[in-house]
């Protein structure tokens, strides 16, 4: 009997090509489409119906079976409730990180095992290897521009070990070329950019449906009122667009940036200039730690880390590491480090894990 791989098919080109490559390698491939959002499932806000039609069309070309599963209840309980609580607390969460750990590599993994899977696979741009102790290791993808290891840092050994990542060494243009060459109907489909499983939508309107809007003052660090915000949940550190602050009489023409949120007074603190000192930090603290190997990294060794997805790695060293507390100091100041986002550590091309920025 051939080895069975259950592939998470999203309707996009990456997971479709991943399924094709696995079939070419001789695996028994079953496609599974995950539907994880039920609210306002209409053509304006959600493309789930079209995505499923794309999955069916891909499965037809590849000659594989496909099934649909609904994890909407799990998504709301494990991901969306956290998402709302973080925004309500003034932080800026990254739902994709939790979505991967709780849905794509937990709910989906459990479902796949129940279907007799030996492995699961996704279209993520990451690699997998093993360390000197034989533990599964998460590696950067060959295509540095598409590498998604930042979003998978919360996986544990039980989740990573049965996972296959066929796109690990492929650049995105080559993935699209493969899709065109074999006649996949979604070869030119654009990449999704919305909130994990919720899709692309007006963010403020979406949040306002679940959290009450609470306008307040925008002030300088000295306390001078320069405008009004629409609700602290709508803003993130380092944000420049959408502040609605014009030039101040007798003041600088430098652009304004969000520097802090004062939850106690419902005040948004803004500063002028990209390089303002309040936007720079050498030290970063984190909690809710998760280490892929199951053990914490050696605090005596140097590492690199990133505090946001598109950021270039920066050299750092660990100053505090115990229980669920991590403190790092970077060699150079980091810009707009944002509570609620993740700081992720790397040892070369190996993603070690990380935590939620305090």
Swiss-Prot record:
<feature type="binding site">
    <location>
        <begin position="8"/>
        <end position="15"/>
    </location>
    <ligand>
        <name>ATP</name>
    </ligand>
</feature>
<keyword id="KW-0694">RNA-binding</keyword>
<feature type="active site" description="Nucleophile">
    <location>
        <position position="99"/>
    </location>
</feature>
<dbReference type="GO" id="GO:0103016">
    <property type="term" value="F:tRNA-uridine 2-sulfurtransferase activity"/>
</dbReference>
<dbReference type="GO" id="GO:0002143">
    <property type="term" value="P:tRNA wobble position uridine thiolation"/>
</dbReference>
<feature type="region of interest" description="Interaction with tRNA">
    <location>
        <begin position="308"/>
        <end position="309"/>
    </location>
</feature>
<comment type="similarity">
    <text>Belongs to the MnmA/TRMU family.</text>
</comment>
<feature type="site" description="Interaction with tRNA">
    <location>
        <position position="341"/>
    </location>
</feature>
<dbReference type="InterPro" id="IPR046884">
    <property type="entry name" value="MnmA-like_central"/>
</dbReference>
<dbReference type="Pfam" id="PF20258">
    <property type="entry name" value="tRNA_Me_trans_C"/>
</dbReference>
<feature type="binding site">
    <location>
        <position position="123"/>
    </location>
    <ligand>
        <name>ATP</name>
    </ligand>
</feature>
<dbReference type="Pfam" id="PF03054">
    <property type="entry name" value="tRNA_Me_trans"/>
</dbReference>
<feature type="region of interest" description="Interaction with tRNA">
    <location>
        <begin position="146"/>
        <end position="148"/>
    </location>
</feature>
<protein>
    <recommendedName>
        <fullName>tRNA-specific 2-thiouridylase MnmA</fullName>
        <ecNumber>2.8.1.13</ecNumber>
    </recommendedName>
</protein>
<keyword id="KW-0963">Cytoplasm</keyword>
<feature type="site" description="Interaction with tRNA">
    <location>
        <position position="124"/>
    </location>
</feature>
<feature type="disulfide bond" description="Alternate">
    <location>
        <begin position="99"/>
        <end position="196"/>
    </location>
</feature>
<feature type="binding site">
    <location>
        <position position="34"/>
    </location>
    <ligand>
        <name>ATP</name>
    </ligand>
</feature>
<dbReference type="InterPro" id="IPR046885">
    <property type="entry name" value="MnmA-like_C"/>
</dbReference>
<dbReference type="GO" id="GO:0000049">
    <property type="term" value="F:tRNA binding"/>
</dbReference>
<comment type="function">
    <text>Catalyzes the 2-thiolation of uridine at the wobble position (U34) of tRNA, leading to the formation of s(2)U34.</text>
</comment>
<feature type="active site" description="Cysteine persulfide intermediate">
    <location>
        <position position="196"/>
    </location>
</feature>
<feature type="region of interest" description="Interaction with target base in tRNA">
    <location>
        <begin position="94"/>
        <end position="96"/>
    </location>
</feature>
<keyword id="KW-0819">tRNA processing</keyword>
<dbReference type="GO" id="GO:0005524">
    <property type="term" value="F:ATP binding"/>
</dbReference>
<keyword id="KW-0820">tRNA-binding</keyword>
<keyword id="KW-1015">Disulfide bond</keyword>
<keyword id="KW-0808">Transferase</keyword>
<dbReference type="InterPro" id="IPR014729">
    <property type="entry name" value="Rossmann-like_a/b/a_fold"/>
</dbReference>
<keyword id="KW-0067">ATP-binding</keyword>
<dbReference type="InterPro" id="IPR023382">
    <property type="entry name" value="MnmA-like_central_sf"/>
</dbReference>
<dbReference type="InterPro" id="IPR004506">
    <property type="entry name" value="MnmA-like"/>
</dbReference>
<keyword id="KW-0547">Nucleotide-binding</keyword>
<dbReference type="GO" id="GO:0005737">
    <property type="term" value="C:cytoplasm"/>
</dbReference>
<dbReference type="Pfam" id="PF20259">
    <property type="entry name" value="tRNA_Me_trans_M"/>
</dbReference>
């Amino acid at each position: 009997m051939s080895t069975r791989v259950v592939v998470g098919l999203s309707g996009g080109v990456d997971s479709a090509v991943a399924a094709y490559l696995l079939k070419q390698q001789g695996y028994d491939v079953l496609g599974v489409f995950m539907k994880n959002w039920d609210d306002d499932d209409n053509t304006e806000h959600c493309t789930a119906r079209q995505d499923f039609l794309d999955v069916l069309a891909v499965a037809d070309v590849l000659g594989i079976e496909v099934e649909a599963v609904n994890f909407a209840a799990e998504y709301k309980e494990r991901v969306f409730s956290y998402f709302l609580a973080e925004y309500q607390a003034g932080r800026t969460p990254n739902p994709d990180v939790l979505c991967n750990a709780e849905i794509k590599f937990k709910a989906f993994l459990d479902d796949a095992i129940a279907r007799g899977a030996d492995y699961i696979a996704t279209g993520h741009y990451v690699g997998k290897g093993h360390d000197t102790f034989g533990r599964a290791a998460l590696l950067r993808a060959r295509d540095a521009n598409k590498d998604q290891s930042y979003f998978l840092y919360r996986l544990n050994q039980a989740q990573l070990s049965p996972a296959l990542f066929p796109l690990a060494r492929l650049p995105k243009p080559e993935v699209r070329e493969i899709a065109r060459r074999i006649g996949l109907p979604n070869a030119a489909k654009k990449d999704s950019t919305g909130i994990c499983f919720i899709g692309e939508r007006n963010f403020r309107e979406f949040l306002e449906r679940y959290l009450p809007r609470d306008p307040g003052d925008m002030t300088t660090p000295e306390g001078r009122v320069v405008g009004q915000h629409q609700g602290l949940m709508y803003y993130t550190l380092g944000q420049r667009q959408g502040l609605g602050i014009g030039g101040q009489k007798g003041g600088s023409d430098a652009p304004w940036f969000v520097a802090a949120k004062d939850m106690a007074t419902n005040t948004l603190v803004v500063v002028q200039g990209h390089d303002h000192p309040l936007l720079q930090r050498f030290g970063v603290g984190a909690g809710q730690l998760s280490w892929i190997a199951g053990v914490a990294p050696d605090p005596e060794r140097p590492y690199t880390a990133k505090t946001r997805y598109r950021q270039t790695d920066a050299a750092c060293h660990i100053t505090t590491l115990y229980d669920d507390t991590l403190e790092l100091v970077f060699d150079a100041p980091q810009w707009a480090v944002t509570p609620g986002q993740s700081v992720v550590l790397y040892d070369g091309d190996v993603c070690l894990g990380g935590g939620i920025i305090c």
